[in-house]
Every structure is written in C-alpha cells, then in structure tokens.
Amino acid sequence: MEKQVRVRYAPSPTGHLHIGNARTALFNYLFARHLDGKFIIRIEDTDVKRNVAGGEESQLKYLKWLGMDWDEGVDVGGEFGPYRQTERLDIYKKLYEDLLERGLAYKCYMTEEELEAEREGQIARGETPRYACNHRELTEEQVKEFEAEGRIPSIRFRVPANRDYTFKDIVKDEVAFHSNDFGDFVIVKKDGIPTYNFAVAVDDHLMEITHVLRGDDHISNTPKQMMIYEAFGWDIPQFGHMTLIVNESRKKLSKRDESIIQFIEQYKELGYLPEAIFNFIALLGWSPVGEEEIFSKDEFIKMFDAARLSKSPALFDSQKLKWMNNQYMKKQDLDTVVELSLPHLVKAGRVGETLSEQDQAWIRDVIALYHEQMSFGAEIVELSEMFFKDHVDYEEEGQEVLNGEQVPEVLRAFAGQIEALEVMEPAAIKAAIKAVQKETGHKGKNLFMPIRVATTGQTHGPELPNAIALLGKEKVLNRLQKVIG
C-alpha cells in the first residue's frame, strides 16, 4: 500500500507573506489536494533574532485569504506536533546527542574570528571557502583547554568523504553533489539551537513528509539533509525544487525591489481579489494543458500535475496580474466592487467616511461606470478623477479634437440642450446629443468627440451619457463654457 502524500509549507516568521513564499505554499497545497494527501504548516522560528512580531499570524492570515486551508499546523494541531520548531528543542537534543555518541557529529570550539581568518585564507589562495575540519579529532587535553578558556562549542556533522549524493528531482530530474565539496557543517549553534538543515531533516522525517517542494535556492541544502537522513537510517523524501521568479529584466525577484509589489497583504490593501491572486500565482512556474489561463481553485486542484512544473524561471508580469484581476472583477456583483473601491476614494479624500443616501447612490453609480474597466479597487481613484475636479486638463490628443472647426458650434448647441434639461439622466442626455446632431448636421466622431473631451477631458472613457449625467449640470456647463470661451 502506497504511503499517503504528506507535504508541508514551513515559513519563518520573519515578515509578511511574500509572493515567492505564497507560490511555495500554493504548489504544496495543490499537490496535496490533487492527490488526496495532507498539507501541513510548520513554523520554522529558530532564528529568533530575525523573527518579527506578528510574522506568524500574518503568514497564516494571508494564506487563508488566498483560499488555502491545511490539515495540520500550529493553529489546528495534529498528531505530529508540535508544529513550531522552538517547541521541538527537546526532540532535536536527543537526536544530535545520539550523533555525538556515535561519532557522526563532534564539538567544534573555533571562534568566529578563527573561522573568518580560515575563510579569508582560502579565498586568497583561490579556493572555494569551506570549513577545513580543524576540530574533527580534538584530544581530551585540547577540549579541556578550550573549555578552560570559556569557549562555547557548536556541533558539526561529520561529512562522509568521497561520496556522491544524487537524487531525482521532481522539477530538475537528476541532481548530483559530491561530499568532498562540503566542509563539516554546523547542526547546532553555540546557543544550543539547531540549524536549519538539521531541524528540517528531523521534522520532515518525524512528520512523515513524503515530498519536499520548495524554491531552488534550497537545492544546495538537499545533500546536507540527505546526509542527516542517512546517518539515522531514515527514508529520504522526494524533492522538487521550483525555479526562481524573475522580474521583467529577467533578474531574480528581490524583496528590496520596490518597483514591484511583492507582498500578499499589499495586494489585498489595493483591492485585488484573492481568487485572482491565487490564479496568477498558480501559473508562476506551472502550466496546464492548453491555452486557457483562468481557472477556479477546484479546477486547479483537479488538474495539478507536478510533472508540468517549469524548468525555466517564472516571469512575474505585473500587467498580466492586472489583466487577470480585471477578468475576475468583471464577474463580481456591484456590491463587491463598491466594497473594494470605496475605501480608496475615502482614503484619497474624494468622499467622506459617512455619506448621505443620495451621495451613496451617486458614488455607487460612478464606480459602476468603471466596473468592466477596473483592474483593482484602488484604481478607481485615478479612473474617476474627472468627477472630483472643477476643471479638467486636456491630453494632447484631446486638444487636437477641440481644435476642430465644428467644435464651437457643436458645444454651443449642446450647452443649450443641457441648460434646458430639468433632470440629468442618461436617456435625456442621449436625446440632447441627437438634437445637437439634427441642429448642426454634425455626426459621428465630429459630434461625440468634442462633447466627450470638453466634458470629461478624455478621448476615451465610460459611457458618455452616463458620465455626463453623473457630472451634473453645473460642472458640465462650466466645462463647456471654458472651451467655448
């Protein structure tokens, strides 16, 4: 009988949920759900200095917002807990003490200064820096001497000599490392806290993880973890290392690159939809069969095949994300779109926090004008700018339109029609434009474009009669007058 698939997402609580980490979580989630397996969340919090207050809560909150759930973890429990590494220190202690007893690990008393001097010497000689194993075979006398000096040891794993470590990677196929390229590596720091590679190998085994899907920046950790598995006689899980995410310059996505929004929390704040972000991330380094790109969560679960994970870097295309979110925005009801947009108009000072019924209805109609066009909630501030200004500026293309010979005649006639209207409604404005056509003989672009540019300042935009109705009589007449002179 085959083992049940068990995968994990194991973030460090060092900050908010990044797009790259979200992708790792998502691919593990889809892999588990597709194969009726278990998805586990484990918190790797042993690097206490880097942990951020609220980091763990933020990770979990935004994974949930994206639509993921998990079977075991810090907040839901499970039979393989605890799921927070700082609560597993006794487990690690028993195991590294076992390695020490069997001579597969040893105490290293070298100071940071000695290690740095060794490293600098290797670089000066043109060698690849690695620990030279100086404290591998210390005598009892040397140990006593170091301890008398007050030196606190770290614990290093004794790397086997002349060994090949190969594994079949789910993404990269055959991957090979040679043990002679590694120095003996630290498995327990001087403060008694296990290092990443030791704790991860122990946790993955004890939690019965069958597949480890992670970013390929972890690939060099894999042979070290394999050595630890081997030292304990444990079965090695299957590894899959997903390619990097790159920006439009084909450089690795860096958290320091502020030209790209990279944290899930920021997308939520901007009024993006979780389903769209889920969809977009699922296609960052994985592709379905066929050309279709819009899928529901259930569709992704049904068709997810790890064999289709890409070997090439995944391009983070911000414009494509906007396009994708727009596809999802179009499907939302107006209430949802208002909910995503209105807070941004309040924040920009366009409307107050409390609105009269009349103002609520008006702003709802303004947002409705852009429902089909809007990429994300915050975009409403820029899109609807013309409704909140007394005067409009004309783009170069718009100015050319207003230079037409027929423009004064068309705009005067239209101003007369608007002046006569008792109620500014789209149907009445449509009728007014038709009346101008009859009166002046101008039609098509020669009729519509001057009216659009003079009233909205734009050559393209929402339905003209609806926009003019919402602008209101006073604003429209003022703008027409400004052009007529």
UniProtKB/Swiss-Prot annotation:
Write down any Gene Ontology CC term: cytosol
**Species of origin:** Bacillus cereus (strain ATCC 14579 / DSM 31 / CCUG 7414 / JCM 2152 / NBRC 15305 / NCIMB 9373 / NCTC 2599 / NRRL B-3711)
- Known partners and oligomeric status: Monomer.
According to the UniProt entry, where is the signal peptide? none
> EC number(s) in its UniProt entry?
6.1.1.17
What family is this protein classified in? Belongs to the class-I aminoacyl-tRNA synthetase family. Glutamate--tRNA ligase type 1 subfamily.
Where is it located? Cytoplasm
Q: Which domain of life is it from?
A: Bacteria
Q: Which InterPro entries match?
A: aa-tRNA-synth_I_cd-bd, aa-tRNA-synth_I_codon-bd_sub2, aa-tRNA-synth_I_CS, aa_tRNA-synth_I_cd-bd_sf, Glu-tRNA-ligase_bac/mito, Glu/Gln-tRNA-synth, Glu/Gln-tRNA-synth_Ib_cat-dom, GluQ/Sye
NCBIfam families xrefs: gltX_bact
Pfam family of the protein (one) = Anticodon_2
Its main subcellular localisation, reduced to a broad class, is cytoplasm
Tell me the protein's name.
Glutamate--tRNA ligase
Q: Note the PROSITE patterns from the entry.
A: AA_TRNA_LIGASE_I
Q: Which residues bind ATP?
A: K255
Q: For this chain's UniProt record, which GO biological process terms are given?
A: glutamyl-tRNA aminoacylation
Q: Which UniProt keywords apply?
A: Aminoacyl-tRNA synthetase, ATP-binding, Cytoplasm, Ligase, Nucleotide-binding, Protein biosynthesis
Q: Which reaction does it catalyse?
A: tRNA(Glu) + L-glutamate + ATP = L-glutamyl-tRNA(Glu) + AMP + diphosphate
Q: Could you confirm whether the keyword Aminoacyl-tRNA synthetase appears in this record?
A: yes
Function text: Catalyzes the attachment of glutamate to tRNA(Glu) in a two-step reaction: glutamate is first activated by ATP to form Glu-AMP and then transferred to the acceptor end of tRNA(Glu).
Motif span ('HIGH' region)? 11-21
Matching entries from PANTHER family are given as: GLUTAMATE--TRNA LIGASE, GLUTAMATE--TRNA LIGASE, MITOCHONDRIAL-RELATED
Instruction: List the ranges annotated as motif 'KMSKS' region.
Output: 252-256
Q: Which GO terms describe its molecular function?
A: ATP binding; glutamate-tRNA ligase activity; tRNA binding; zinc ion binding
Top EC class for this record: ligase
